[in-house]
Amino acid sequence: MGLYRIRVSTGASLYAGSNNQVQLWLVGQHGEAALGKRLWPARGKETELKVEVPEYLGPLLFVKLRKRHLLKDDAWFCNWISVQGPGAGDEVRFPCYRWVEGNGVLSLPEGTGRTVGEDPQGLFQKHREEELEERRKLYRWGNWKDGLILNMAGAKLYDLPVDERFLEDKRVDFEVSLAKGLADLAIKDSLNVLTCWKDLDDFNRIFWCGQSKLAERVRDSWKEDALFGYQFLNGANPVVLRRSAHLPARLVFPPGMEELQAQLEKELEGGTLFEADFSLLDGIKANVILCSQQHLAAPLVMLKLQPDGKLLPMVIQLQLPRTGSPPPPLFLPTDPPMAWLLAKCWVRSSDFQLHELQSHLLRGHLMAEVIVVATMRCLPSIHPIFKLIIPHLRYTLEINVRARTGLVSDMGIFDQIMSTGGGGHVQLLKQAGAFLTYSSFCPPDDLADRGLLGVKSSFYAQDALRLWEIIYRYVEGIVSLHYKTDVAVKDDPELQTWCREITEIGLQGAQDRGFPVSLQARDQVCHFVTMCIFTCTGQHASVHLGQLDWYSWVPNAPCTMRLPPPTTKDATLETVMATLPNFHQASLQMSITWQLGRRQPVMVAVGQHEEEYFSGPEPKAVLKKFREELAALDKEIEIRNAKLDMPYEYLRPSVVENSVAI
């Protein structure tokens, strides 16, 4: 009983306020009180109420709210509600961060994270059960294509729960940038429709100067072997390269190649031989674009790491050997320049296909979607792991629906310009699912498996390890607050259900690929949650942010190839130009690359979310330390990059987005 001071915070996004009245109730351990005053929440404002409550409520557990309307339901985005009790009592925060629609009653639990074991009296048990029951109706598993990991049910944006939709500033920026890209494409098409492309410099007609200094560097130096090799270490797709343990069985040496074999074996013995194998593309059906057959290869590249850190190609094999056929030719740096350049173009095109489908879409976007759906179905908002992970799930469902309806849909961008479009992209995604191993999502294990630990010129490896370690310590700090023993982990039914839902349902039985179906110890929880957060932040950034830099100059990353892979070494400039994308394909690649790869004006850097899901000083101290470590890493990378000829920026915490939001 006594005077209560209530503050209500409304989101700042367009339309976040509401013309509807909002009524509040306070629910304590010993009673409940309806507040006589009502409020009209205004966008970006805090509304304060002071109410005399005659009843004794005891410690506050919930704030309940109901938005009433007469003629029109006007949705309201509520950030949080705080309550200060009589006298000099502590202020208690009730996080919301969601849209309030309709006229039903919404209960907001006090912001302290609680596992089931931390609620021995069961004060929140009914709320947990009812919230998850409602969530499971909203968040249902779907199956975009048979044979793939699962996704959120619903084929259209408006099938998504309102809380998964872009806020207005994000929506406007995304749609305006898309319209701008398509308008520029139309202009370029009209200017080039009657012109013939005869020279590689003709690609300058569609190149957007000034968008990226690194893209201009790529345009000027893309033919160099050093830049070709560098991309496997620090380019848009740094997850293919591995140190060779032996010469690949597919590498068949034709007569007269004994010297090459000896050179490779020497590098192998010295531990400086690396490979990039694109065998996953073998057998994938190539696209047909406007009645014109496109083509795919499945290259193998062998590279040597020099003492100065440069990674240089030694040999390229474009196709796998076939029984009963002569071995495929091996292309060498000493071959005629156009033959060697064309072979490298084939590798870059193959890397483009695997990058966009396997590394980016499957391992970034679709994996993050599994984490989102499982989290919303299995962890109530009061659970500490939910509070920890929810900032890293923002906007993922909408951007993925947009991808499925615009990029990889029937007649989408992939079908229009990609050599894997027209169904090959789905076939490739299915086959790539076999390589979704638990260890490959965890940089300490993945980099060790690929032999990249200690490679000083692999800035991706260095930065990924550092960011992983910082995230791990952050997760460990929160986990240690709520799980004092391993038994507490084993006895948390919501945590176990969440883990099992990801592995068995979302990932379609991934326990045979190392994913856990249960968590038995605190360190296992830390590792698993760190994997989830790193996948949604650092790993996605590492394969997303480089697109504008490395793919703007189309010959460096051709979206399709219009002639078959060469079987001889008599290539000419005419052969190269006839193989690379035509002007429309190249223009569309450039436009989409700009729209998706540009730095986003509406973004939240990793760890910098404004939402406060936790109450209490201890979790806030953990978050503060996390942000300090991120800032220190960002500064270290900045200092290192200042000394580099080609800075590596993609894992700088200040540019890594907090979720898969683009």
Swiss-Prot record:
Protein topology in the membrane: Peripheral membrane protein
Entry's EC annotation: 1.13.11.31, 1.13.11.33, 1.13.11.-, 1.13.11.12
Amino acids binding Fe cation: H360, H365, H540, H544, I662
Involved pathway(s): Lipid metabolism; hydroperoxy eicosatetraenoic acid biosynthesis
Example of a GO MF term: arachidonate 15-lipoxygenase activity
Ranges where the Lipoxygenase domain occurs: 115-662
Location, primary (coarse class): cytoplasm
Result of changing R205Q: Does not affect arachidonate 15-lipoxygenase activity. Does not affect protein affinity for (9Z,12Z)-octadecadienoate
Annotated InterPro entries: LipOase (IPR000907), LipOase_C (IPR013819), LipOase_C_sf (IPR036226), LipOase_CS (IPR020834), LipOase_Fe_BS (IPR020833), LipOase_mml (IPR001885), PLAT/LH2_dom (IPR001024), PLAT/LH2_dom_sf (IPR036392)
Listed Pfam families: Lipoxygenase (PF00305), PLAT (PF01477)
Consequence of changing P617S: Does not affect arachidonate 15-lipoxygenase activity. Does not affect protein affinity for (9Z,12Z)-octadecadienoate
UniProt cofactor note: Binds 1 Fe cation per subunit.
The protein's enzyme class: oxidoreductase
Impact reported for G422E: Loss of arachidonate 15-lipoxygenase activity
UniProt-listed Gene3D superfamilies: 3.10.450.60, Lipoxygenase-1, Domain 5, PLAT/LH2 domain
Domain notes: The PLAT domain can bind calcium ions; this promotes association with membranes.
Family label: Belongs to the lipoxygenase family.
Identification of the protein by name: Polyunsaturated fatty acid lipoxygenase ALOX15
Organism of derivation: Homo sapiens (Human)
